[in-house]
Every structure is written in C-alpha cells, then in structure tokens.
Curated annotation (Swiss-Prot):
Species per Swiss-Prot/TrEMBL record: Pseudomonas aeruginosa (strain ATCC 15692 / DSM 22644 / CIP 104116 / JCM 14847 / LMG 12228 / 1C / PRS 101 / PAO1)
Sequence positions that bind pyridoxal 5'-phosphate: N75, G178, T179, T180, G181, T182, S259
Name used for this protein in its record: Cysteine synthase B
Reaction catalysed by this enzyme: O-acetyl-L-serine + hydrogen sulfide = L-cysteine + acetate
EC number in record: 2.5.1.47
Lineage top rank: taxon: Bacteria
Lineage per the UniProt record: Bacteria, Pseudomonadati, Pseudomonadota, Gammaproteobacteria, Pseudomonadales
Gene Ontology MF annotations: cysteine synthase activity
Length: 299
C-alpha cells in the first residue's frame, strides 16, 4: 500500500536512530545518534515549531491570517516559516546578521519576512526587538524561550521515540542547549521511564561560539529551563565541535551542523568513562546550512 500524508507537517518526527561505527573506536558502549535533520524543514526545531502554533490555535490565541513573530538563530525560524506556510500565517523572523546565508535564504523561501539585528546585539537584541514589535501591535510573539509548548513537543515525540528505538536500554542522553526545549522535554520523558537515565547538556565554553547554542546571561536564561532536569553540563570549545562535525561527515557519512558535532564530541568524551552503556546524542540539523561559513572547507 502506498503511504500518503495529508501535509508536509505530518512528516515531522519518527526520525532514524543510527549507530556510530568508526568514531567510537574499541568500546563496549553503544553510541547512537538521532537524525533530526531528516525532518521536512531540516532540523529538530520542526517539532516545537508545529507544537507552538498548533497548541496556540487550540487555545484560541491565534488563527490563520494572523502575524507571528519570533527571534531565532536559524533553525527555529526555518521551521516556523514552514509551519506558517502550511497553516496560513504571516511570519516575521528576527535574527543576528552573522547567521549563515543558507539560513536566511531558507526563511525567505518559505515566505517569511526577515529582520536582521547586528551580531553585537545578538540573540538578546533579537529577542528584545521581537517583544517591541509585539507591544507595537505588529503580531504575536511565540517565544520559544518561555513557551511550554516547546519542551512539550519533545516530551510527546522525541523522548518516546528514543525510548522505543532503544528498547528502553538508553543509559545516557546528550543534547546541545539553545532554548533548552529538546533537553527539557526528553529529560522529563526519559526520567519518567527510568530515573537512572543520565541527561547531559552541552554549552559553549567561555569565548567559544557554536551556532544555535549559547551560554545565556542570567537575565536571558530561557524560562523553560529547569537545571534539575540536567545531570551534567559539558563545556565545549568550538574547535572540538567543528572537528567532530567534519569527522562525522567523512567517517560516518553523517552531514550535520556544528552544535551536532559538539553533542557527539561530548558523547565520545562520556563514553570513555563508561562500560556497557547506551548513549544517544541529537543530530539537530544538516550540514548544508553551514557551508558558506567555511567550516567544511578542506583543512
């Protein structure tokens, strides 16, 4: 029987879980990566983007034809632009101007209006401008950083998928932290199944810049973040994240972004401390969004 989907939105989720073959080396551990770049708009953010819009509709907060606003470093914006196109919303996205050309082009390809702030203003400036536009009546901010529908998407989809795909054998979960929606939702689900599962978050070390994740100043810390749901936070240098990202492509055939390289680098570090463990890391997007930045240039 031919499988048909009503819309592209119905293709979000149920992404593959793949075992790493070469990077782990000799080990008794099983190292797995979840390929979120296989989602229609190319990242893990497809899940919360649809969740935030759909649940807001169900509450009566928005309806097709409205204008939605969001500050983004890239992936959420692309996912929201796709979701808005499917559901009939106007989308205003605000992002730092040092984001890659591929991300900007993807957003406008879906029909979103793109507003750039300076790299000095960064994501903090983008978030402030989004709030300002909402106060001025330009539209409604979805606010992925404070919106409970963000982690709920992962509680109801990503977490259960990982549990099912590992047959409940997962011992460690590793995820980069930006809005923290992925790690919050997955942690809640996995800990309900087995409180012994260890949740490991990744953030850039001081002075490092890894696209899509941040060391947030206290006043901008995502409101959805609950530190008690994370057992360990790993600080990662961008050089290590980029090195593992390139090795994933060349040794495993997995073409991903820098924060995904960081998550796998953290998983590899962790694996060296363990025996007979089952580790899962999130590959949150695809590498084609980073080509213009030069991170994949021959070295």
């Amino acid at each position: 029987m031919t499988v048909q989907y009503p819309t592209i939105a119905d293709c979000v989720g149920n992404t593959p879980l793949v075992r790493l073959q070469r990077l782990p080396g000799e080990t008794s551990n099983t190292l797995l990566v979840k390929l979120e770049g296989n989602n229609p708009a190319g990242s893990v953010k497809d899940r919360p983007a649809l969740s935030m819009i759909t649940r807001a509709e169900l509450r009566g907060d928005i309806r097709p034809g409205d204008t939605l606003i969001e500050a983004t470093s890239g992936n959420t914006g692309i996912a929201l632009a796709m979701a808005a196109a499917i559901k009939g919303y106007k989308m205003i996205l605000i992002m730092p101007d040092n984001s890659t050309a591929e991300r900007k082009a993807a957003m406008t390809a879906y029909g979103a209006e793109l507003i750039l702030v300076s790299k000095e203003e960064g994501m903090e400036g983008a978030r402030d401008l989004a709030d300002k536009l909402q106060r001025e009546g330009r539209g409604k901010v979805l606010d992925q950083f404070a919106n409970g529908d963000n982690p709920e998407a992962h509680y109801h989809s990503t977490g259960p998928e990982i549990w099912q795909q590992t047959g409940g054998s997962i011992t460690h979960f590793v995820s980069s932290m930006g809005t923290t929606g992925t790690i919050m939702g997955v942690s809640r689900y996995l800990k309900e199944q087995n409180p012994a599962v260890q949740i490991v978050g990744l953030q850039p070390m001081e002075g490092s810049a890894i696209p899509g994740i941040r060391r947030w100043p206290q006043e901008y810390l995502p409101k959805i973040y609950d530190a008690s749901r994370v057992d360990r936070v790993v600080d990662m240098h961008q050089d290590e994240a980029e090195d593992i990202m390139r090795r994933l492509a060349r040794e495993e055939g997995i073409f991903c972004g820098v924060s995904s390289g960081g998550a796998v680098a953290a998983m590899l570090r962790l694996s060296r401390e363990l025996e007979n463990a089952v580790l899962v890391a999130i590959i949150c997007d695809r590498g084609d969004r980073y080509l213009s930045s030069g991170v994949y240039d021959p070295r």
